[in-house]
């Protein structure tokens, strides 16, 4: 459960990330593919080379979904319902992959925003990504 302080930390961090969210999303995907090669199996039709247009496009989709979650932090299940349906019923993504991407997002954000990435912000973002992952996997049951 995100506390009021967590919600404020997440909103502040996301504001600092700002227009770079799509780039960071793409970098986190690349990081995930390199660190956890089995995750590539969900993207057989993608050019997975560094800087590919497909990774950039999907990274922006990830960032846009997270921005939507931040903007609806008090109703993430409602805001992410269609995305949850897509990942559970059509794409059938293994739920563990959300945790892997969350970790890669944390590493990417910490590397680009060290001043903003305090221990409290790190903890809040970790909880936020876990909450997003829970929502995205809620329709698997």
UniProtKB/Swiss-Prot annotation:
UniProt binding sites for O2: 58
Keyword RNA-binding: no
Source superkingdom: Eukaryota
Domain named Globin: residues: 1-141
One cellular-component annotation, GO: hemoglobin complex
Binding positions (heme b): 87
UniProt keyword annotations, A-Z: Heme, Iron, Metal-binding, Oxygen transport, Transport
Function in brief: Involved in oxygen transport from the lung to the various peripheral tissues.
Protein name: Hemoglobin subunit alpha-2
């Amino acid at each position: 459960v995100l506390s009021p302080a967590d919600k404020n930390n997440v909103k502040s961090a996301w504001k600092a990330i700002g227009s770079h969210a799509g780039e960071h999303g793409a970098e986190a995907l690349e990081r995930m593919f390199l660190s956890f090669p089995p995750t590539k199996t969900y993207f057989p039709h993608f050019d997975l080379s560094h800087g590919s247009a497909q990774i950039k496009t999907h990274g922006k989709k990830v960032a846009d979904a997270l921005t939507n979650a931040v903007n609806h932090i008090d109703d993430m299940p409602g805001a992410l319902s269609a995305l949850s349906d897509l990942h559970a019923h059509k794409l059938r993504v293994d739920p563990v992959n959300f945790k892997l991407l969350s970790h890669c997002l944390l590493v990417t954000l910490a590397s680009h925003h060290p001043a903003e990435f305090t221990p409290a912000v790190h903890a809040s973002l970790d909880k936020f990504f876990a909450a997003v992952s829970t929502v995205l996997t809620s329709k698997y049951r």
